[in-house]
């Protein structure tokens, strides 16, 4: 994801996820409110602490005048718990947490028409079941990658061919 796309996505998401009380998606973007509180996985939304190339916040703050506050969470359960307590505008939840947040009414639908380039997304990503519920879109894809099944060859001399060995 380019830095510009990351900044744009952050802006749109921040504006689209203003409060849980709003039942319908926004119809237009207004001036930023001045503060954006985010729950994120460590390393997902950075100020360049670990690598100067990954400072996604400073330019966003400069362009919008909106202060970004990031609270990192180590697990999906922690993200869901923090969102339940309130006070956050955006969460970088994984699929398992996304559905809990949606069903728990902790997030609101977003208006994808306000997101530049939404129509160009691969439908496999844009229509993800982990953020599309009841005909409404509750999130945007941030990253996409494999979930690997690794195993100990001493325990499984024949490679597992299904996740059923885990669940």
Feature roles, as predicted:
Residues 27, 88-90, 108-149:
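A structural signal for short loop-to-beta-strand junctions that line the ligand-binding cleft
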Residues 1-35:
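Short, low-complexity disordered leader/linker segments with a strong preference
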Residues 40, 151-153:
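Pocket-edge structural micro-motifs
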Residues 164-167:
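Short, intrinsically disordered, charge-balanced linker/junction segments flanking boundaries
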Residues 154-161:
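Short helix-loop capping/hinge motifs at secondary-structure junctions, enriched
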Residues 23-101:
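Early extracytoplasmic/lumenal segment of secretory-pathway proteins
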